[in-house]
């Protein structure tokens, strides 16, 4: 099992290229099921979760072709063509779905186009309870018959789904994506109230419009979808990853470095940039993306509360906790989105971080210096927060179970090493 070795204490300086957003790509890929024509996606990140989704779609009968030349050593220049002309299987099996919760996003498209779907209940990072009940209740409102049997969601509908007024009792990103896709082929108008407003949902909606969907209110909390009889193919480029952007912004800050993030969308970074600015980091837009500098002055603790977009993202909480562990003074970090999302805390305390958890809040008191240690990744964002802490720590840190990291970050050690980080991947105890 791979591990990562880091010797901390070097300020990072240079440029890092930001890839396409994992969470956008994982919703865009199943959208291919809504048409028999080809959906061509560019700027796809090369990640384990993307491969898992590709394997799931292939199991349904989607044919795929990867064209174009790779740019920047990654898959930035590649175009993935997905064609769902001959779908022979509407079952999403447990062995694939258990690896990643986003697999449930095939449910809406399969049901809308084929009138049936059998999808295993989802897996992914073990962070609290992520109920798919909200997806299922909304599909029932649209006329679907839903049963749970042997760990599978069995959904069917006579004829087409019917437009409905769906009001989500709480904001759900996956639920909004599933119902948005299903509604494009439903009969009549669907209104999705209390819809999630994440940029990845805007990206999905704009791709669906490019495929012939009729959607109003994109980017707002109320989406109106006028169903059409069929969608067609399209070419679409995945939005840059705001979480990857934020993570490398914190890498610059925590090492007191200076990094330009090429390809970053500055307009999607408002909540993260506000927090970074408040704690003393200099953030500015550049013609190529954004620049983050923390090589002058000190970092001070600030309070953070995670919220649905446009609030501070839950997927940046662990990274900011690492930064606050090195800041002057105290900060309070409150997690309102997911339960059980402080699994990185015991590992950070092994490195000398001073963190006390009280329910859904963590009090972080900045430590004079973190020190290297053997630590273990428990989930995707926790794993990268340990890498960030290690970059700032004195001495050597070994991060174990980095397969979590590969689910969400493309070539992380390569990108950091290019900015001066002393970092290497170890395979079975030896350097690659």
UniProtKB/Swiss-Prot annotation:
Binding site for UDP-N-acetyl-alpha-D-glucosamine: 101, 130-134, 315, 337
Record's keyword terms, sorted: Cell cycle, Cell division, Cell shape, Cell wall biogenesis/degradation, Cytoplasm, Peptidoglycan synthesis, Pyruvate, Transferase
Reactions performed catalytically: phosphoenolpyruvate + UDP-N-acetyl-alpha-D-glucosamine = UDP-N-acetyl-3-O-(1-carboxyvinyl)-alpha-D-glucosamine + phosphate
Active site: 125
GO CC terms of this entry: cytoplasm
EC nos: 2.5.1.7
Modified residues (2-(S-cysteinyl)pyruvic acid O-phosphothioketal): 125
Single annotated GO MF: UDP-N-acetylglucosamine 1-carboxyvinyltransferase activity
Biological processes annotated in GO: cell division; cell wall organization; peptidoglycan biosynthetic process; regulation of cell shape; UDP-N-acetylgalactosamine biosynthetic process
Record-listed phosphoenolpyruvate binding positions: 22-23
Protein name per its UniProtKB record: UDP-N-acetylglucosamine 1-carboxyvinyltransferase
Species annotation: Paramagnetospirillum magneticum (strain ATCC 700264 / AMB-1)
Gene expressing this chain: murA
């Amino acid at each position: 099992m791979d591990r990562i070795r880091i010797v901390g204490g070097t300020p990072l300086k240079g440029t890092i290229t930001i890839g396409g957003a994992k969470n956008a790509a994982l919703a865009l890929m199943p959208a291919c099921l809504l048409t028999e024509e080809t959906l061509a996606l560019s700027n796809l990140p090369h990640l384990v979760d993307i491969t898992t989704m590709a394997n799931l779609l292939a199991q349904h009968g989607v044919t795929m072709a990867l064209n174009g030349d790779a740019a920047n050593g990654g898959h930035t220049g590649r175009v993935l063509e997905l064609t769902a002309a001959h779908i022979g299987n509407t079952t999403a099996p447990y062995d694939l779905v258990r690896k990643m919760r986003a697999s449930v996003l095939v449910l809406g498209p399969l049901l809308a186009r084929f009138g049936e779907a059998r999808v295993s209940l989802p897996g992914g990072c073990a962070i609290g309870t992520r109920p798919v009940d909200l997806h299922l209740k909304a599909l029932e409102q649209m006329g679907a018959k839903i049963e749970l049997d042997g760990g599978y969601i069995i959904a069917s509908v006579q004829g087409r789904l019917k437009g409905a007024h769906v009001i989500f009792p709480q904001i759900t990103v996956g639920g909004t994506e599933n119902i948005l896709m299903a509604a494009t082929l439903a009969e009549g108008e669907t209104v999705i109230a209390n819809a999630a407003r994440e940029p990845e949902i805007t990206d999905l909606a704009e791709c669906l419009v490019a495929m012939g969907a009729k959607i109003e209110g994109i980017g707002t909390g109320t989406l109106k979808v006028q169903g059409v009889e069929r969608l067609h193919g399209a070419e679409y480029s995945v939005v840059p990853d705001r979480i990857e952007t934020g993570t490398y912004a914190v890498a610059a800050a925590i090492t007191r470095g200076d990094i330009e993030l090429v390809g970053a969308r500055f307009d999607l970074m408002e909540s993260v940039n506000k927090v970074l600015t408040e704690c003393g980091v200099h953030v500015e837009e550049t013609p190529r993306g954004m620049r983050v500098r923390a090589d002058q002055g000190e970092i001070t603790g600030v309070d953070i509360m995670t919220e649905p977009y446009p609030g501070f993202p839950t997927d940046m909480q662990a990274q900011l906790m690492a930064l606050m562990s090195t800041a002057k003074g105290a900060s309070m970090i409150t997690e309102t989105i997911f339960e059980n999302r402080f699994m990185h805390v015991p590992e950070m305390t092994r490195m000398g971080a001073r963190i006390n958890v009280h329910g859904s809040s963590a009090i972080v008191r900045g430590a004079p210096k973190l020190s290297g240690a053997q630590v273990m990744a428990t989930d995707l964002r926790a794993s990268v927060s340990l890498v960030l802490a290690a970059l700032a720590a004195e001495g050597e840190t070994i991060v174990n179970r980095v397969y979590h990291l590969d689910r969400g970050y493309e070539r992380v050690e390569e990108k950091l090493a290019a900015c001066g980080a002393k970092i290497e991947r170890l395979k079975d105890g030896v350097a690659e």
